[in-house]
Amino acid sequence: MKKIISLILAVLMICATLMAFASCGKKEDTLVMATNAAFPPYEYKEGDSFKGIDVEIAQAIAEKLGKKLEIADVEFGSIIGGVQEGKYDFGMAGMTVTEKRLESVNFSTTYATGIQVIIVADGSAIESLDSIFVFDENGDPTGLQNPEIKVGVQQDTTGDIYCSDDITNWGLNDVEEDGTITTDRVVRYKTGAEAVAALKSGKVDCVIIDNEPAKSFVAANEGIHILEGDNEYAIEDYAICVAKENTALLEQINKALAELTEDGTIGKIIEKYIPTSN
C-alpha cells in the first residue's frame, strides 16, 4: 500500500513539474499585458486590433526585451488582482500610482501625465469648480453647492477614488473618519462611455475622467463639453504595475522606459495620439 501511495505521489510530482515547465515555456518569449481597451487614446480597439498610446509603448518595451506582446482586455478593476496572481505580467491602462495600489503592486517610472477633467451637458448649471464646491478663504473645499449632485465615473479609476473621498479632501462624498461613506454621490460605470451616456440621459450631473478620453467622448457626442479654464479636477502621473515579487521585470521595464524616453520613442508615440499643436 505504501509503495502504491509513493508511486502515485511520484507520478503527481513528475506531472506537476512537467506542467510547470510547459507553462514556463509557453510564456518564455511572451509578455502578457492586462488593459481595459475602452480608454482612448491610451487603449482602445479598432475591429480586432488594439490601438493607443499604452499599446504602442508596451509593444516597444516588449521589443526591447526581445519578447512578443500579448494583450488581455479585462475590466479595469481586475487588472491589479490579475497581476498579483500572475495571470498577467504587467498592467498598463492609463493607471495612476496611489498609496492604496502600492499596497498590492509595484509601479514603474512615469511615462505620461494625465489630467482629470469635468464633462457637463451644454447649458448645465455647473460652469466651474466654484459651481460644485463651497470654498473657504484658503481655497479649500468645505461643502457642496448642490448636496444632491450625482457624479459619473468609470469604476475603480482614480476619478472614482478621488470623487469617493470626503469633501474636505476634494471628494464628493460625506465620509466618516473610519472611511465609512454616509452619503455616496458617485455613480460608477464599467466604462467611460457608459458614464457619458448617463450624463446625456440626465442620470448624472457631470462626469469626471481623464482629459484625453474626455476629448474623444466629447468629439463623438453632441450636447456635452469639458469645463475649460482653471477647472482641472486633478493632475496625475501614469505608470505600469508589476507584481511585487517580480522585481526583475520591473527593472527591465524601467530600463526600457528610460531608453525609449531617451531616444524619443515615447515622445513620438504620445505626439501621434495627442498632437501638441491641438
PLM features per residue range, with description:
Residues 121-150, 170-174:
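Flexible hinge/capping segments at coil-to-helix
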Residues 32-37, 107-137, 241-244:
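Hydrophobic/proline-rich hinge and linker segments of small-molecule sensing/allosteric domains
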Residues 77-78, 95-104, 162-165, 193, ...:
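A ligand-binding cleft/hinge motif common to bilobed small-molecule-binding domains
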Residues 28-95, 188, 263:
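Extracytoplasmic small-molecule ligand-binding "clamshell" domains
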Residues 35-39, 72-77, 86-98, 114, ...:
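Beta->alpha turn/N-cap motifs
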